[in-house]
Amino acid sequence: MATINQLVRKPRKRKVQKSDVPALQACPQRRGVCTRVYTTTPKKPNSALRKVCRVRLTNGFEVTSYIGGEGHNLQEHSVVLIRGGRVKDLPGVRYHTVRGSLDTSGVSDRKQGRSKYGTKRPK
């Protein structure tokens, strides 16, 4: 334990918290342009073709973003909105595309959990 005199001379250092989503620069979402849309395979116990896209953001960062939901309409030069949130079984994917905003369509025929996939309420 430090004495009061030692703390007066040299105060305690604050721990600096490192951001999980540095490319957002403390913003809730960021806009960007798709530079490449492709599929990748997940890490060891899982098996699938996960849809991801490489996005050049308005602040100059280039990040990999996951496209959630069944089916999508994204291609190169599509303008997308990305949010934070990593995909545990895809290394290097720390962002999600926001469905139903800008050029990204919502998931069609979605009945439950619609707000997460940008789907309007069915009539």
From Swiss-Prot:
Keywords: Methylation, Ribonucleoprotein, Ribosomal protein, RNA-binding, rRNA-binding, tRNA-binding
Source superkingdom: Bacteria
Modified residues (3-methylthioaspartic acid): 89
Membrane-crossing segments per the record: none
GO biological process: translation
Annotated GO CC locations: small ribosomal subunit
Compositional bias of kind Basic residues: 113-123
Coiled-coil ranges from the UniProt annotation: none
Disordered as annotated region, ranges: 100-123
Keyword tRNA-binding applies: yes
Pfam families named in the record: Ribosom_S12_S23
Signal peptide start and end residues: none
Family: Belongs to the universal ribosomal protein uS12 family.
Role summary: With S4 and S5 plays an important role in translational accuracy. Interacts with and stabilizes bases of the 16S rRNA that are involved in tRNA selection in the A site and with the mRNA backbone. Located at the interface of the 30S and 50S subunits, it traverses the body of the 30S subunit contacting proteins on the other side and probably holding the rRNA structure together. The combined cluster of proteins S8, S12 and S17 appears to hold together the shoulder and platform of the 30S subunit.
The protein's assembly and partners: Part of the 30S ribosomal subunit. Contacts proteins S8 and S17. May interact with IF1 in the 30S initiation complex.
Protein name: Small ribosomal subunit protein uS12
Species: Saccharophagus degradans (strain 2-40 / ATCC 43961 / DSM 17024)
